[in-house]
Each structure stands twice: as C-alpha cells, then as structure tokens.
Amino acid sequence: MRQPFEEYKGKFSSKTRSTLNRKIRKYTEHCGGSISWKLYKSAGEMPEFFQLARTVSQVTYQEKLLDAGLPDSEEFRREMDQLAQQGHVRGFILFYQDIPVSYLYCPVVNDVLIYAFLGYNPSYMNFSVGTVLQWLALEHLFAERCFRFFDFTEGQSEHKKLFATHHIQCANVFFLRSNLRNRLLLHSQRIVDNFSKLTGDKLDQLGLKSKVKKMMRFGI
C-alpha cells in the first residue's frame, strides 16, 4: 500500500473503473452533492465509532445470519481502545445525512490492515454503500503511506476479488482418526460441498445467483 493510489487504480479495467465511478456518483447525487464519511483512529474517537458502527451492525446480515457483526462486548471495546492508544486501528463510517449506513473496522498487525468487521444497512443496498465506503477508505489509506498491505483475510467473495490485487491459497487442516464414523462424515461433507457448487454454478448460468443471495440475506 505504499504505491500511489492512482497506480492501484490501474489494476482495474476501464469498465470496472467506470462502474465504481458510477456508484460513487450515484451516491453523491443521493446525498445532495457531497458524500459524508469519517475516519476514526484515536482512543478518544473510537467510542463514537463503536456506537455508530453497532447501529449499522445490528441490522446487517453478517450479524443476523452469521453471528459475525461487530462484537458488542466490554472485552472488544477494551481491545479496541488499546489498539487505538497504540495507533493500531482504523475505523470508517459512511453517512447519509447524519445516519450511519456502512462501517469498516480494521485493526493493524505488523503494519498490515486486517479486514476484520464490516457491514451496511440493507435499506441503502441499492446505493452500494459498502463498496463506496471501501473505495473511500482505500483511497485514504493509500495516502497515509503507513501500511504494507490490506489483508482481506480468508474466504471468497466478489467484494474481495474486486478490490484485492493478490491472493494466496490457505486452508484449515484437521487430522481425524481413520474410522467408519469419520469417513461417513467426510463423505457427507463432500456431497454437501459438491451440491452447493453445482447449485451455485447453475444459478450463475441462469443469472439468478445474485438474486438468490439477496433473498437469503435480506428476504427480498
């Protein structure tokens, strides 16, 4: 992340850059001509970030379906405060007027930003507020010139594929005893994985995958 932001933008095709610019322009117009967002990084700023981010997190599919929202615990708040005192955290909030609509929380480990918690209010989904905030945050972080990488962590998503520049293979490895029970479990897991992949591929071919995802996440 110590290269200029303009150089990073060069990794996108002209079509993708046009799409991103269109999304930002659409949200700018929705906001009346200018986008309101805020960076949080000091210990004095993080309580405000936490309050606003929790307002968003509690309505996200990450929290409702995956139990992966911004933790609402004293332990997390203490950890966040400690990181802020050391300068090892960045938080971002995107607003519509004075309403928080998306958030991004990134602790810093060895000069690497970790894509830890994020979410957006589904009521603003049509304005791509998650993508807009990610773009604005990256632009700012490149300008800071303080970090080596932005780690999108493990897992696959279109969002990560869009913004990442590199990837590495990673896996969770389990050692199991060779017995009938474990073999049946592994076989069942393969069946489920294959069915999921085949279903996803078929929905993708039919142009229905994104619609089904929205139905599962947001009930629409």
What is each residue range found by the language model?
Residues 2-126, 218-219:
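A conserved beta-strand-loop-helix scaffold within acyl/acetyltransferase catalytic domains
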Residues 110-169, 174-175:
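Acyl-donor binding region in acyl/amide transferases
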Residues 1-6, 148-207, 212:
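Active-site/acyl-donor-binding loops of N-acyltransferases
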Residues 19, 42, 84-87, 140, ...:
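A general structural signal for short secondary-structure boundary/capping elements
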Residues 19-25, 61-65, 118, 129-131, ...:
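Glycine-rich loops and low-complexity Gly/Arg-rich segments
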Residues 7-8, 30-33, 71-77, 91, ...:
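Low-complexity, flexible helical/coil segments
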